[in-house]
């Protein structure tokens, strides 16, 4: 009987030890759940994209949209990389005094030709990238390394407003983006009410993309803005394209009343 008791006690002790060891092993194998919460944002092409619920490091390829994100979000804290030309909207402008963080944004990940250095973007911890809607190849490459992408565009006022809402959803600032669109609609109605396009004596307005004399006002919402504002776009009928350029001699010939650009590069044309 004593031997049986001893064997039983030994067996129970062994089982307890095995159980303890298994418990330790299970605890060691358990890793903290680091899966980030996500949400779905539908971009301008209708792609349903899973993005971080709380996006923190955004790369923005479209030049003016770095400023758009600042306007919707209220700061540049969640911006990480921007197009080099986008910095021209910051340096020497009112934004320079309001947001010191903007000056620290990376301007090398995104090249002048709008391409994205995929490896650098991944190393920089970019968690979402905003691209023009024609950048499908860049979007595919970024997605493969785990960086979700949203495609936007501003060829028409409708797509411009949709893109505002897309960015608002990304930032969790849908109401603010909607208010910006409402403000646009209100202002637009006031301008249209003046029916300035019916004037016979209209100023000619040349709108350029940059100092390389690439056209802009003929292939995006600026064409409509020029029209309802009472201006005449001499290149309004030119087939829209991102690479469409004109010669300086052509500008002399047209002698437009107004030359404008969305970017600071236009300053180079003053002379």
Regions found by a protein language model. Give the residues of each.
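Bacterial N-terminal signal peptides that target proteins for export
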Residues: 1-11
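Bacterial Sec-exported substrate-binding components of ABC uptake systems
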Residues: 2-4, 23-68, 175-206
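Bacterial Sec-type N-terminal signal peptides, specifically the leucine/valine-rich hydrophobic h-region
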Residues: 18-21
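Short helix-initiation/N-cap motifs at beta->coil->alpha
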Residues: 44-46, 105-119, 239-248
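A short, structured surface patch at a secondary-structure boundary
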Residues: 66-120, 128, 234
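Proline-aspartate-enriched helix->loop->beta-strand connector
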Residues: 110, 118-131, 147, 247-261
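Extracytoplasmic substrate-binding proteins
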Residues: 138-214, 235-237, 245
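Alpha-helical, coiled-coil/dimerization segments enriched in small aliphatic residues
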Residues: 217-243, 247
């Amino acid at each position: 009987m004593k031997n049986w008791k001893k064997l039983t006690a030994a067996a129970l002790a062994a089982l307890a030890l095995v159980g303890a060891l298994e418990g330790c092993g299970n605890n060691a194998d358990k890793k903290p759940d680091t899966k980030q919460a996500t949400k779905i944002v539908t971009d301008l092409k209708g792609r349903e994209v899973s993005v971080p619920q709380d996006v923190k490091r955004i790369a923005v390829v479209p030049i003016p949209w770095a400023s758009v994100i600042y306007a919707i979000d209220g700061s540049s804290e969640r911006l990480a990389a921007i197009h080099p030309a986008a910095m021209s909207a910051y340096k020497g402008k009112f934004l320079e005094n309001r947001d010191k963080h903007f000056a620290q944004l990376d301007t090398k990940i995104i090249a002048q030709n709008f391409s994205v250095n995929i490896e650098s973007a991944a190393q920089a911890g970019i968690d979402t990238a905003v691209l023009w809607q024609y950048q499908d190849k860049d979007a595919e490459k970024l997605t493969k390394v785990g960086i979700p992408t949203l495609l936007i565009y501003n060829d028409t006022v409708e797509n411009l407003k949709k893109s505002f809402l897309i960015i608002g959803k990304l930032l969790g600032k849908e109401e603010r983006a909607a208010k910006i669109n409402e403000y646009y609609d209100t202002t637009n109605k006031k301008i249209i009410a003046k029916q300035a396009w019916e004037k016979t004596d209209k100023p000619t307005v040349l709108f350029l993309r940059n100092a390389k004399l690439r056209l802009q006002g003929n292939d995006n919402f600026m064409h409509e803005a020029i029209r309802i504002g009472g201006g005449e776009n001499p290149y309004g009928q030119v087939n829209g394209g991102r690479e469409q350029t004109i010669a300086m001699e052509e500008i002399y010939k047209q002698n437009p009343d107004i030359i404008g650009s969305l970017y600071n590069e236009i300053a180079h044309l003053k002379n």
